[in-house]
Amino acid sequence: MYYVTPRQLVFPGDVIATADSKVEGPVYLDNGKYRSLVVGLVEFREDVVVVVPLEGTYKPKKGDLVIGYVTDVLATGWEVDVRSFMPAYLPVGEALHRHVDLETTPLTTFLNIGDVVVAKVKDVDLTDEYPIILTLKDEKVGKVESGTVVEITPVKVPRVIGKRGSMLNTLMELGCDIVVGQNGRIWVKCKDPRDEVFLASLIRKIEAESHVMGLTDRIRAEIENYKTSKQQGTV
């Protein structure tokens, strides 16, 4: 028995069909019913119902490094946009390293709407009110004070990193700090603002040409040309 129709938009947790049905795609079995794991569209292929993930939606996993924007200040933490199917939740206890009296200290003292954070995904539980829990209690995480955030399609993140980190190491030849979030947000911080603009353009080029052979060498050549132009004062 099916609970969906062709081209229907489904969200994580939505019931797709009963266990005796043929279902494919990112789904899970719960009490005799298939439920969707992702935001996707339903397709019927002969006698099989298929959930097709919508490209660009980040699918969080425990341990992922993500870059998010604070979208709301709650009573005991913050709501954070991580480009997923639902906002993530950053509890006070996972953000601060000391006790805070919430009755006398407003949370906006630490993080406010619009702030950018680099965080780790601590847990993912689709049965919770906030399925995605974040933490700042890890290395290389915390509030981002400056720099540039570039957004790409999450599925292109491995290309920006490259095999054994080859592409990322190439990008870092400019001497900038770069943090790649698994949710498709990339933070870049350089001493020279022009370098940030240049790196942002390279990252978008990698996204657009991820299928091209020899892309790492081409990006390295562009960086060398850029360095030469800076030395000559033509940038």
Curated annotation (Swiss-Prot):
In its UniProt record, which GO terms are filed under biological process?
Answer: CUT catabolic process; exonucleolytic trimming to generate mature 3'-end of 5.8S rRNA from tricistronic rRNA transcript (SSU-rRNA, 5.8S rRNA, LSU-rRNA); poly(A)-dependent snoRNA 3'-end processing; RNA catabolic process; U4 snRNA 3'-end processing
**Record key words, sorted:** Cytoplasm, Exosome, RNA-binding
In alphabetical order, the GO MF annotations are: poly(A) binding; RNA binding
Keyword set includes RNA-binding: yes
Which Pfam families would you find in this protein's record?
ECR1_N_2, KH_6, RRP4_S1
List, alphabetically, the PROSITE patterns matched: S1
Q: One GO cellular component from the entry?
A: cytoplasm
| Full protein name | Exosome complex component Rrp4
Transmembrane stretches, start-end? none
Recorded family membership: Belongs to the RRP4 family.
Does the entry feature the keyword Cytoplasm, yes or no?
yes
Enumerate the spans annotated as KH domain.
147-203
How this chain assembles, per its entry, is: Component of the archaeal exosome complex. Forms a trimer of Rrp4 and/or Csl4 subunits. The trimer associates with a hexameric ring-like arrangement composed of 3 Rrp41-Rrp42 heterodimers.
Spell out the HAMAP family in the cross-references: Exosome_Rrp4
The protein's organism comes out as Pyrobaculum aerophilum (strain ATCC 51768 / DSM 7523 / JCM 9630 / CIP 104966 / NBRC 100827 / IM2)
Function in brief:
Non-catalytic component of the exosome, which is a complex involved in RNA degradation. Increases the RNA binding and the efficiency of RNA degradation. Confers strong poly(A) specificity to the exosome.
S1 motif domain location: 63-137
